[in-house]
Amino acid sequence: MRSVIADSRRLVVKVGSSLVTNDGRGLDHTAIGRWAAQIAALREQGKEVVLVSSGAIAEGMQRLGWTRRPREIDELQAAAAVGQMGLAQVYESRFSEHSIRTAQILLTHADLADRERYLNARSTLLTLLRLGVVPIINENDTVVTDEIKFGDNDTLGALVANLIEGDALIILTDQQGLFTADPRKDPAATLVQQADAGTPELEAMAGGAGSSIGRGGMLTKILAAKRAAHSGANTVIASGREADILARLASGEAIGTQLIARTARMAARKQWMADHLQVRGHVVIDDGAVEKLTEGGKSLLPIGVVGVQGAFARGEVIACLNAAGREVARGLTNYSSAETKLIQRRPSGEIESVLGYMLEPELIHRDNLVLV
């Protein structure tokens, strides 16, 4: 089996906290130097690399003299603010040894949920790559609470892979890859060398929490691979403790777990909608509407809506739930939540008589709808 990285030109590399810190005691400058050297070697092979790096909070904790990760959000944000300075400085210094310029980009999921900001971020990243710069990306933990509390850079790496239409996402961790079971508890557990991204069984295999320094577990990596597949990006989950891991993957050596994107690449607009981690609201649809969306490729009409949840405006991304509460699709709504409540369960021909106007006959047009 050959590594998919060998034939990939545009890469997103995510390194976890444990691979760039001294077990939480600040940044490991030597380790970061090795990552810079490996990425420099990839660039000499003609590959473009975007680096998603954790480590800001761990560095901030060290600079502030804290030995335990704080629980209070404001203290986490303070640690991130202090640590981000050091993280940027070390990467700039180490990459400069290879005559490579770096750029710091701090993102939140909200940045990528807004269409205009999404396109601006994409344009900036592609320009940096064209200029030969290595973008260093991290979540903007200083201003966002949800990302610190629940988020992870595995997901961010997948979103960035989709943003720049990367060929592959490499998630480097302190584990060898995905096992069929927890190898610490099951001696019969074996490494999953290759599988299709999004296979339901993979989520059942994944489990366990991250360390006290980082936040990501194996499940987040499996879900990140599923998300990266939206843009056709393959994912490799491998141990960053392996010597020269990036060079070996680029040479074709199969290391860790390869998760292959088998589904067709989504159109850019639908990919953006699918990547929303949070939607503004939900509509519950009947079984007939579910069938028309999932099997017939039809638009969602008001008559198929049986319930409205949350507050949303026209043009926002909303989720479509079946009777069991499972999301089956999402898309851009033509009507607000208040308007939808008035026209639900009604045929499109009655919209104007109910509202006094009709913007569109569909609640969500099929061109603005994506199955999930």
UniProtKB/Swiss-Prot annotation:
CDD domains: AAK_G5K_ProB, PUA_G5K. PROSITE patterns: GLUTAMATE_5_KINASE, PUA. GO terms for molecular function: ATP binding; glutamate 5-kinase activity; RNA binding. One of its GO terms (cellular component) is cytosol. Residues 280-358 form the PUA domain. Its EC number is 2.7.2.11. The keyword Repressor does not apply. Its main location: cytoplasm. Substrate binds at S54, D141, N153. ATP binds at K14, T173, D174. Pathway: Amino-acid biosynthesis; L-proline biosynthesis; L-glutamate 5-semialdehyde from L-glutamate: step 1/2. One of its GO terms (biological process) is L-proline biosynthetic process. It is found in: Cytoplasm. It is an enzyme of class 2 (transferase). Keywords: Amino-acid biosynthesis, ATP-binding, Cytoplasm, Kinase, Nucleotide-binding, Proline biosynthesis, Transferase. InterPro entries: AceGlu_kinase-like_sf, Asp/Glu/Uridylate_kinase, G5K_ProB, Glu/AcGlu_kinase, Glu_5kinase, Glu_5kinase/COase_Synthase, Glutamate_5-kinase_CS, PUA. It catalyses: L-glutamate + ATP = L-glutamyl 5-phosphate + ADP. Catalyzes the transfer of a phosphate group to glutamate to form L-glutamate 5-phosphate. Belongs to the glutamate 5-kinase family. NCBIfam families: proB (TIGR01027). This is Glutamate 5-kinase. It comes from Paraburkholderia phymatum (strain DSM 17167 / CIP 108236 / LMG 21445 / STM815) (Burkholderia phymatum). The lineage of its organism: Bacteria, Pseudomonadati, Pseudomonadota, Betaproteobacteria, Burkholderiales.
